[in-house]
Amino acid sequence: MKLKSVLLDEKAVNRTLIRISHEIIERNKGIDELVLLGIKTRGYPLAKRIASYIKGIEGVDVPVGSVDITLYRDDLTKISEDLEIKNLDLGLEIKDKKIIIIDDVLYTCRTARAAIDAIMDVNRPRGIQLAVLIDRGHKELPIRADYVGKNIPTSKNEVIAVSLKEIDGEDSVKIFDK
């Protein structure tokens, strides 16, 4: 793959997450009954950062959990019978809560749909919203993000790579040609 452009550097990633944090607070008229669920792998550290920014703004902790959508993906053809079903790593209650699913990139919307399915299998929240760092278009399902860091229209021959300090050692969003 050939690097085409650096779309967001560390400062831009942080500014974007701070803005999304403010939008979440404003849209929900505060943070009562909010739960942030990050989609593994990069959605979870993003959820933790947004929770940290919200705490800095509101002075209150927001519960954070993760959702593993592996068993809910419709593009996997074979799943081992020995595989442990562990879709939500919460340690918290989601019934009647306002859930915000957080992911790094929204592309076809299949990951978001799988996360919604995983959440609904556990319990019925009051509502579900979606926050993404990057929306690159190419939706295959009628799902849209409620909070978008940056809209990046791409071709099918381009790849968006999100790097996060917690996983990759740096914060950046880059676009590559395949």
Curated annotation (Swiss-Prot):
This is Bifunctional protein PyrR. A motif (PRPP-binding) lies at residues 99-111. Keywords: Glycosyltransferase, RNA-binding, Transcription, Transcription regulation, Transcription termination, Transferase. Its EC number is 2.4.2.9. Pfam families: Pribosyltran. Homodimer and homohexamer; in equilibrium. GO terms for biological process: DNA-templated transcription termination. NCBIfam families: PRK05205.1-4, PRK05205.1-5. Belongs to the purine/pyrimidine phosphoribosyltransferase family. PyrR subfamily. It catalyses: UMP + diphosphate = 5-phospho-alpha-D-ribose 1-diphosphate + uracil. Regulates transcriptional attenuation of the pyrimidine nucleotide (pyr) operon by binding in a uridine-dependent manner to specific sites on pyr mRNA. This disrupts an antiterminator hairpin in the RNA and favors formation of a downstream transcription terminator, leading to a reduced expression of downstream genes. Also displays a weak uracil phosphoribosyltransferase activity which is not physiologically significant. The keyword Lipoprotein does not apply. GO terms for molecular function: RNA binding; uracil phosphoribosyltransferase activity. The keyword RNA-binding applies. It comes from Clostridium beijerinckii (strain ATCC 51743 / NCIMB 8052).
